[in-house]
UniProtKB/Swiss-Prot annotation:
Organism: Xylella fastidiosa (strain Temecula1 / ATCC 700964)
UniProt: AMP binding residues: 31, 36, 57-59, 85-88, 92, 133, 144
Protein name from the UniProt record: Adenylate kinase
Keyword Kinase: yes
Gene assigned in the entry: adk
Pathway the protein contributes to: Purine metabolism; AMP biosynthesis via salvage pathway; AMP from ADP: step 1/1
Sample GO molecular function, one term: ATP binding
Catalytic activity: AMP + ATP = 2 ADP
Amino acid sequence: MRLVLLGPPGSGKGTQAAQMQETLQIPHISTGDLLRSEVVAGTPLGLQAKQVMAQGDLVSDAILLGMLESRLSHTDVVKGFILDGYPRNLSQAAALDGLLAKFGHPLNAVVQLEVPTDVLVERIAGRAQAEGREDDTPDAVRKRLQVYNDSTAPVIGFYQQRGILLRVDGVGRLDEVSQRIAVALGC
């Protein structure tokens, strides 16, 4: 099963992806983790990304797609994968479609974790306070959420039009949300 897990910061994507990885026995591919590991490994794409990040710029879609293509060529993804952190915009969604078409394996589903803004702000601000991060104020969190919503809304529409978007309530205990995802996926 080839899945994308979408949701705003604080929605529990990483937590749910880890749970889904265990349940479905397919790898969780976090583009953030992938980017960091490529940089640490000193791969050609990692070196390009490191140079871009050192200048304070965002890593290009082309570099991310190259890293993802490399990762999807590994044998552990034959049975599927859970992709987290990508796509973040419409051009990335189209690029992912093209990449998966190249492999002959389109997405089966896109799970959208839906969590109200006030709950997200509470989760992130609480996590930031516990970690001693002063930059995640409620106002800063709301701004990040707005940026996410602005860039991701078209992606959600893109997958909804294709009939593969599954909206799941992301509020509740870990096991409750995991159960909702399993039901939505028919597992």
